Amino acid sequence: MKPIAIQPASLTFNNEGTPVSRDFDDVYFSNDDGLEETRYVFLDGNQLPERFMTHPRDSFIVAESGFGTGLNFLTLWQAFAAFRDAHPDATLQRLHFISFEKFPLTPADLKSAHAHWPELAPWAQQLQAQWPMALPGCQRLVLDGGRVTLDLWLGDINELVDTLDDTHNRQVDAWFLDGFAPSKNPEMWTPGLFTAMARLARPGGTLATFTSAGFVRRGLIEAGFDVVKRKGFGRKREMLTGALSHDAPPPARAPWYARRPASGDKDVAVVGGGIASALLALGLLRRGWQVTLYCEDDAPAQGASGNRQGALYPLLSHHDAALAAFFPAAFTFARRLYDALPVSFDKDWCGVTQLGWDEKSQTKINQMLDLALPDTLAHGVDAREVRERCGVKTGCGGIEYPQGGWLCPAQLTAGVLELAQAHGLRVHYGHRVSALHREDLDWQLDFANGAQARHAAVVLANGHQLSGFPQTEKLPVYPVGGQVSHIPTTPGLGALRQVLCYDGYLTPQNPANAMHCIGASYHRGVSEMRYQEEDQQRNRQRLIDCLPAASWAQEVDVSAGDARCGVRCATRDHLPMVGNAPDYAATLRDYATLSQDASAPETVMPAPVLKNLFVLGALGSRGLCSAPLAAEILASQMSGEPLPLDGATLAALNPNRLWVRKLLKGRAAS
């Protein structure tokens, strides 16, 4: 797999303090008054914020062709905030901004550029605090308590727009066609971009751009926009505005992975009680849903989310494009979300080091390093550097994740649920769902205690019990039992400053209790776990066997029998299942000839699914990393919003993927 490295912008500041691109020899905004130019060209040119008052939906979606310093975004955010303050009961509640940038600014340059506009400081500071790493693809930033979403797509816009999945089609209410001047950057201003703009725009969706170049006007008209010239800003003679003139839906490109939003009332039952269900509930509540959580236990986080300490770091793969795309995005999203949550839980972003303790593990690490990821995400370390950073001798090098660390999943889950309850979540503990079935337009849930409930939609986020219903029993998931040992600190163990990963993992001590976590055992196919002394000893011995040069490892004492058992839900491809619950029988029936039909996707029926039934699970042992983004994807999908991953990666998360892959190859799905 060929790595794609994102290069930062190379810029300087001119005598007026305006940033200037060295690569394109052009200013990022007007020397005269960049803020007023943005208001005139992009806000006034799209009749904003006037359209906010009459907008019929709860979210207004803007797309932009060049993020640059973020001036357009910040100016629009300021206007949207003023609108929300003046009209808190308006239909429009949230702003969704999608932007593309090939050369993102460094954090320092971004801050310097923002110093130009003191009046934008309240919004600029929030953007700076969440400014993402330079990773290819989409980085979703959830701002202003969820009222503003920024999807920042890093890379070449003409390549990226073709990777957007079909949930982006006909979504954009307004386009900001910005970027360096066509004469300076002709590679961006292409017919392919104009066609993609039309595909993504809603019928009647508008556009505005600072240029009046003839080929731009003609290209937009050919793509389907009605385009007019108007007076340009300041000394510029003309600019262009327009609106999409046709209402022809674009053809689906991969209908076998089609994702459907929820329909009907925004009323959902979430079945679960762990971190995934808690974050999903919070995300749906912020989107105006009525959410009820049903948990079979008497308290939250009694399953795989109940550990005292869990490591947070991405799963990297040199061989699987979906893994390589999903987990870095998931990890960075998780860090931003955990840092922004107004929830108290034990954590330490102390870093994580994954060790190359033998030839096989070191080869794997070398392949990870070939991904050319930013050093702020992952970089190689030798044995000396491991000792300096981790505080203990291991005798081997590895790969360090400097922004990783550990957190307490049980406290996090409880805190998120408490926060969600403050926003209207209804929670019913001691409610085990024994059956699901459709009743008229709703789903009926039957509980083991004899109670019943009806909801318009249902999400199964119930861990290893995901496949425990007739509707989901064919999902290719499996349970993995495991045991984590809790060990007291010692002088040698107390020196550990980072999470160590080997053929197991060991956390630094939690200062709150002077205990470490070491684990975990792995029993595929085991759905009921009880304490095993053999697992306790195995957790200790794996550390000693992997790090024979580490004398401090001998201090690990598991004799107290202090441990926690749990069961994970996993898939063969190590990716979660996020999306509509697929209809297995209909998939086999409708896609019997998919291997032949796929050459003409416009003739293929959309993926058969069970209406308003969704799944969020199979998070395996990386739930702390994957749950936040997975929950965000599902909340967005159910609400009919654009999703924060490219189409190929979303397909790799689709619960029907393993069946469809076989059918596409002409093989039986079962």
Swiss-Prot record:
Cofactor(s) listed in the protein's UniProt record: FAD
An example Gene Ontology CC term for this record: cytoplasm
Keyword S-adenosyl-L-methionine applies: yes
Record-level Gene Ontology MF annotations: flavin adenine dinucleotide binding; oxidoreductase activity, acting on the CH-NH group of donors; tRNA (5-methylaminomethyl-2-thiouridylate)(34)-methyltransferase activity
UniProt main location, coarse: cytoplasm
Top-level taxonomy: Bacteria, Pseudomonadati, Pseudomonadota, Gammaproteobacteria, Enterobacterales
Catalytic activity, as annotated: 5-aminomethyl-2-thiouridine(34) in tRNA + S-adenosyl-L-methionine = 5-methylaminomethyl-2-thiouridine(34) in tRNA + S-adenosyl-L-homocysteine + H(+)
Similarity annotation: In the N-terminal section; belongs to the methyltransferase superfamily. tRNA (mnm(5)s(2)U34)-methyltransferase family.
Pfam family, one: Methyltransf_30
Name of the protein: tRNA 5-methylaminomethyl-2-thiouridine biosynthesis bifunctional protein MnmC
EC number(s) recorded for this UniProt protein: 2.1.1.61, 1.5.-.-
Gene3D superfamilies in the cross-refs: D-Amino Acid Oxidase, subunit A, domain 2, FAD/NAD(P)-binding domain, Vaccinia Virus protein VP39
Region annotation (tRNA (mnm(5)s(2)U34)-methyltransferase) ranges: 1-245
Region of interest: FAD-dependent cmnm(5)s(2)U34 oxidoreductase: 271-670
Designated gene of the protein: mnmC
Function: Catalyzes the last two steps in the biosynthesis of 5-methylaminomethyl-2-thiouridine (mnm(5)s(2)U) at the wobble position (U34) in tRNA. Catalyzes the FAD-dependent demodification of cmnm(5)s(2)U34 to nm(5)s(2)U34, followed by the transfer of a methyl group from S-adenosyl-L-methionine to nm(5)s(2)U34, to form mnm(5)s(2)U34.
Species of the source: Cronobacter sakazakii (strain ATCC BAA-894) (Enterobacter sakazakii)
Signal peptide annotation: none
